[in-house]
């Protein structure tokens, strides 16, 4: 007679097998009623023997007790977003950029997937067992949704198969099929509950329930699209190969994933998916196109927040017709004058739209737009509403011409348009209240100086009351002065002052980004900081020297040079430093002066280390003059291979690069 443990093991194995056939292979072997019977049998046994319940049991999907709040999980590998293209011309331009960046006219194949309209999640498996799950969040830190993800039957609690890595982070999209969405809303209408506008909102709301038992009742599902952390194992060297391997281990992958050999095949895939879109049974808003070769992906690299080797090719957004009631002009951080159409409110793609961007004067002329016109509105990328065209055949008789301002609508300064540029700009600089507001909002933003609690409404009041003119004035604010603002009590005022004090300690890269120099985003600011090391060196740099920084061309170099040449900007920087803004001094390492076997070498770490953390090893190597890289290439001098080293070790051996183990690294570090 079988023991209770054996019965439980067999039941769990059987249920996992049928979950795999149903959710991954779409080929169920048994009726739903039989699956339910097996599940009931397992539940009854575990109820009688709770000491034998395991975390990966299929019964553990039903949800734990409600959470008071979500804790945070920091992504070990950032969850980047994708750049978008919206037409064939833009995709072909992306294809050309990829081809141009690759050397020796290498052939590129593309892995094409559906762009699911759901919620991006990260799921970490250790030794094949699901241990945590998180939302994308800001790309660096997400919310811990482990308890909720465990309730989604499509997601395996335990991977099955061979050669499963010790640590594997699966990334993908949680979404709600149309049928499930309609059922949720039908139930909500009947019971007086919340009715969701679209399946994505319903999926997000379901996944972020503090009570996992509610999530368990929602018919969420999941498709994998990539990998994050990989330790103690190997994966295929192509994106498609990795997805197919995940499928073997029990992770759901869309059967619409397709390998395309050319740009023409990609376009054919795009149009086929667009044609099939209404019959898929779930929402998508485009296709995702990725370079299939992992080696080519490494060559192409990343920009600030997106890979160069992938793009989202969005479908045309839904469109509606409405009337333009007025055109107003907004002033941005750099003085750009942007015309905005004020519309008769209309629902577009589930959202009530009352404003739409008109971009610039050229766009108004191209459209032939007049105030009062009937227009077609599109939510470009399903995010930013824009005017597509004017319905000339239905133009009312009382329309009025749109007159682009010659003077700033906020400060009255002259508006100038540089020859060759589409954007007209206010020349008022920081005397313009609008520019001042937007500059200050940028300065305190999370990726700049990161002043917690300093919201847009506070900045608006500070400028309107003439309390603040430059970023340096922010650090002169007192709690007493802040309490004079609307909805600002003594406690909140003190919190803002404390946040400003904390923000004084920053990094050189963040400081440069916060200054708001034209065309200088996060990545460029980081590159400038790394190259020049000090503010003094950067201020003294010529346009020619600035162009030596990776990805800095003549236009960006000119903007940076002109910014520091302006006396008022230098004065603001001096004031900021006088108020205590500071960052760590750069560690200048001259490899030629260091007597170390690692000096001047490009080193790659792979596998797990037992005697020190990887971060500690990197720091020690840098101290000894090494440059630590993240991937193996022909430029790599040395690979340090820990336990369970994977594809990087194989590539190093293929290229004939010197490889040492952890013990040899420790010996050399000690020498």
From Swiss-Prot:
* Residue stretches making up the BRCT domain: 593-671
Which biological process terms from the Gene Ontology are attached to this UniProt entry? Answer: DNA repair; DNA replication
Could you list this entry's UniProt keywords, alphabetically sorted: DNA damage, DNA repair, DNA replication, Ligase, Magnesium, Manganese, Metal-binding, NAD, Zinc
In this entry, which stretches build a coiled coil?
A: none
Gene Ontology cellular component terms for the protein in this record: cytosol
User: Which cofactors does it use?
Assistant: Mg(2+); Mn(2+)
Q: What is its EC number?
A: 6.5.1.2
A single GO molecular function, which one? metal ion binding
Source species, domain of life: Bacteria
Residues bound to Zn(2+) are 408, 411, 426, 432
**Annotated NAD(+) binding sites:** 32-36, 81-82, 113, 136, 173, 290, 314
Active site (catalytic residues): 115 (n6-amp-lysine intermediate)
Reaction catalysed by this enzyme = NAD(+) + (deoxyribonucleotide)n-3'-hydroxyl + 5'-phospho-(deoxyribonucleotide)m = (deoxyribonucleotide)n+m + AMP + beta-nicotinamide D-nucleotide
Q: Which InterPro entries match?
A: BRCT_dom, BRCT_dom_sf, DisA/LigA_HHH, DNA_ligase, DNA_ligase_AS, DNA_ligase_CS, DNAligase_adenylation, DNAligase_N
Task: Provide the family line.
Answer: Belongs to the NAD-dependent DNA ligase family. LigA subfamily.
* HAMAP family reported for this sequence: DNA_ligase_A
Protein name per its UniProtKB record: DNA ligase
- Species of origin reads Shigella boydii serotype 4 (strain Sb227)
List the taxonomic lineage: Bacteria, Pseudomonadati, Pseudomonadota, Gammaproteobacteria, Enterobacterales
Gene behind this protein: ligA
């Amino acid at each position: 007679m079988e023991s209770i443990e054996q019965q439980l093991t067999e039941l769990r194995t059987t249920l996992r097998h049928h979950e795999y056939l149903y959710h991954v292979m779409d080929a169920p072997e048994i009726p739903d009623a039989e699956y339910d019977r097996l599940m009931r049998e397992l539940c009854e046994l575990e109820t009688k023997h709770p000491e034998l319940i395991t975390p990966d049991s299929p019964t553990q999907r039903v949800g734990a007790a409600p959470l008071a709040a979500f804790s945070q999980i920091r992504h070990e590998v950032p969850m980047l977003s994708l750049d978008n293209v919206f037409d064939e011309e833009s995709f072909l331009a992306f294809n050309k950029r990829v081809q141009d960046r690759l050397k020796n006219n290498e052939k590129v194949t593309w892995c094409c997937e559906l762009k699911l309209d759901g919620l991006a999640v990260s799921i970490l498996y250790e030794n094949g067992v699901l241990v945590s799950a998180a939302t994308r969040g800001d790309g660096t830190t997400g919310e811990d949704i482990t308890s909720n993800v465990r309730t989604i039957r499509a997601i395996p609690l335990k991977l099955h198969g061979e050669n499963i890595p010790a640590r594997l982070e699966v990334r993908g999209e949680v979404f709600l099929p149309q049928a499930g969405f309609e059922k949720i809303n039908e139930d909500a209408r009947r019971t007086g509950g919340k009715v969701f506008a679209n399946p994505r909102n319903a999926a997000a709301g379901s996944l972020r329930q503090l009570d996992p038992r509610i999530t368990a009742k929602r018919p969420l599902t999941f498709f994998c699209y990539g990998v994050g952390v990989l330790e103690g194992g190997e994966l295929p060297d192509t994106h498609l190969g990795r997805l197919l391997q995940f499928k073997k281990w029990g992770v759901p992958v869309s059967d619409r994933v397709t390998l395309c050999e050319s740009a023409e095949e990609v376009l054919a895939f795009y149009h086929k998916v667009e044609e099939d879109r209404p019959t898929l049974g779930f929402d998508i808003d485009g296709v995702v196109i990725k370079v299939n070769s992992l080696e080519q992906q490494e060559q192409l690299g990343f920009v600030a927040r997106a890979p160069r080797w992938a793009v989202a090719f969005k479908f045309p957004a839904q469109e509606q017709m409405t009337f333009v009631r007025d055109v107003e002009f907004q002033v941005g951080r750099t003085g750009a004058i942007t015309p905005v159409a004020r519309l008769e409110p209309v629902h577009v793609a589930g959202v009530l739209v009352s404003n739409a961007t008109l971009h610039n004067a050229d766009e108004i002329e191209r459209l032939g737009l007049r105030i009062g016109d009937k227009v077609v509105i599109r939510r470009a990328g399903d995010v930013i509403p824009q005017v597509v065209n004017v319905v000339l055949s239905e133009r009312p008789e009382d329309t009025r011409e749109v007159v682009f301002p010659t003077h700033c609508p906020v400060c009255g300064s002259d508006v100038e348009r540089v020859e060759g540029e589409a954007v007209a700009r206010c020349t008022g600089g920081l005397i313009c209240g609008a520019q001042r507001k937007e500059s200050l909002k940028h300065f305190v933003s999370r990726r700049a100086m990161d002043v917690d609690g300093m919201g847009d409404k506070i900045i608006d009041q500070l400028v309107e009351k003439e309390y603040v003119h430059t970023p340096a004035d922010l650090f002169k604010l007192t709690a007493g002065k802040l309490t004079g603002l609307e909805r600002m009590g003594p406690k909140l005022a003190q919190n803002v002052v404390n946040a400003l004090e904390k923000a004084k300690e920053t990094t050189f890269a963040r400081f440069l980004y916060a200054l708001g120099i034209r065309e200088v985003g996060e990545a460029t600011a980081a590159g400038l900081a790394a190259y020049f090391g000090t503010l003094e060196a950067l201020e003294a740099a010529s346009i020619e020297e600035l162009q030596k920084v990776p990805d800095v061309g003549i236009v960006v170099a000119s903007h940076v040079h002109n910014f520091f040449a302006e006396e008022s900007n230098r004065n603001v920087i001096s004031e900021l430093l006088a108020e205590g803004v500071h960052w760590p001094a750069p560690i200048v390492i001259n490899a030629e002066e260091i007597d170390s076997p690692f000096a001047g070498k490009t080193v790659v770490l792979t596998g797990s280390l037992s005697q020190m953390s990887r971060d500690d090893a990197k720091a020690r190597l840098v101290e000894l003059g090494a440059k630590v890289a993240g991937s193996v290439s022909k430029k790599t001098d040395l690979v340090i291979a820990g336990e369970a080293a994977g594809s990087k070790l194989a590539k190093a051996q293929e290229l004939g690069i010197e490889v040492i183990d952890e013990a040899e690294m420790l010996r050399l570090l000690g020498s």
